[in-house]
């Protein structure tokens, strides 16, 4: 399957124009390549249903949040009608191409929810996916794992492992997430894995001492890119780092550009009451650089360097 590459048009400038107009900055841009990032997000959308989306303000804000992401992993999609996500995509597709992939409804009781991937189908495709086989019933909502292409020669694909823990079993579920990672690697031999979601990994659900002792903290190669102490909650009365992103793999590390929460109430100038109609969580996101070394013919590069010399020596 071909991967989308940032396009670049190369043209040798007229020598006289080059001597007068070129400076070093354009050359550096050419050598470094594009700086566009590929953004992967996770968002606990707080009991997302079709009825919730019929509220115009909720729909408009959700569309703006989703449109920022190349892949979004939604949690707490609780609608069993199969109509919620297609309805949401109708609004999203007005300017770009989107597809989605969802799990079945998961949960031990009458309350169940889905994991849903919404992704830019013009930038990425699903290579494979599976529901983790939780034979020991450790997870309330076992991870729904997906393998995506990426528009990068350095990192052609990445595996996403979402998890929404149940607060009473946070430590047990997060330690079992290491077994999910091993299962992913055994299946696809891909070490570039991003584990993400509402881990409930803070405050009353998980003490700092227990957080430090987690397997994903003590095993080498796992990088928690949302800092401890970063508030991922909307309510002013809480300050908890519930939502997390954990990155593994050399390719992910090489291309890691940024990771952050997205304070959508601040961005969209919402009151706390208005924001809580959408969710009580902020989305969390990681950006992977798409920059790749440009293949510039050596004689073109030499000509460009020579053309710069007069302007630098004047």
Swiss-Prot record:
GO terms for molecular function: DNA nuclease activity; endonuclease activity. Residues 1-37 form the signal peptide. Keywords: Disulfide bond, Endonuclease, Endoplasmic reticulum, Glycoprotein, Hydrolase, Nuclease, Signal. Its EC number is 3.1.21.-. It is found in: Endoplasmic reticulum. Gene3D superfamilies: Endonuclease/exonuclease/phosphatase. InterPro entries: Deoxyribonuclease-1_AS, DNase_I, DNASE_I_2, Endo/exonu/phosph_ase_sf, Endo/exonuclease/phosphatase. The active site is at 113, 164. Glycans are attached at residues 102, 133, 239. GO terms for biological process: DNA catabolic process. GO terms for cellular component: endoplasmic reticulum. Disulfide bonds join 203-240. SUPFAM superfamilies: DNase I-like. Belongs to the DNase I family. This is Deoxyribonuclease-1-like 1. It comes from Mus musculus.
């Amino acid at each position: 399957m071909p991967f989308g590459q940032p396009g670049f048009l190369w043209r040798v400038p007229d020598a006289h124009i080059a001597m007068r107009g070129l400076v070093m900055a354009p050359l550096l841009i050419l050598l470094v390549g594009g700086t566009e990032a590929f953004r992967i997000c996770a968002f606990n959308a707080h009991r997302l249903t079709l009825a919730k989306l019929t509220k115009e303000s909720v729909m408009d804000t959700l569309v703006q949040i989703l449109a920022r992401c190349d892949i979004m992993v939604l949690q707490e999609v609780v609608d069993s009608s199969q109509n919620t996500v297609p309805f949401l995509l109708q609004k999203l597709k007005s300017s770009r191409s989107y597809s989605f992939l969802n799990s079945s409804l998961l949960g031990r009781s009458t309350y169940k929810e889905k994991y849903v991937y919404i992704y830019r189908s013009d930038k990425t495709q699903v290579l494979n996916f599976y529901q983790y086989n939780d034979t020991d019933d450790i997870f309330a909502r076992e991870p729904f794992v997906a393998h995506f292409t990426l528009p990068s020669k350095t990192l052609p694909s990445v595996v996403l492992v979402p998890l929404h823990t149940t607060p009473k079993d946070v430590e047990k579920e997060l330690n079992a997430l290491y077994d999910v990672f091993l299962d992913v690697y055994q299946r696809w031999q891909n070490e570039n894995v991003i584990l993400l979601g509402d881990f409930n990994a803070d405050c009353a659900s998980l003490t700092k001492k227990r957080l430090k002792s987690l397997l994903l903290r003590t095993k080498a190669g796992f990088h928690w890119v949302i800092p401890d102490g970063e508030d991922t909650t909307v309510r002013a009365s809480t300050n908890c780092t519930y939502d997390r992103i954990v990155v593994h793999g050399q390719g992910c590390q090489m291309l890691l550009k940024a990771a952050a929460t997205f304070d959508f109430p601040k961005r969209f100038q919402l009151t706390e009451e208005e924001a809580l109609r959408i969710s009580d969580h902020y989305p969390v996101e990681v950006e992977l650089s798409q920059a790749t070394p440009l293949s510039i013919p050596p004689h073109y590069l030499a000509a460009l360097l020579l053309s710069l010399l007069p302007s630098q020596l004047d």
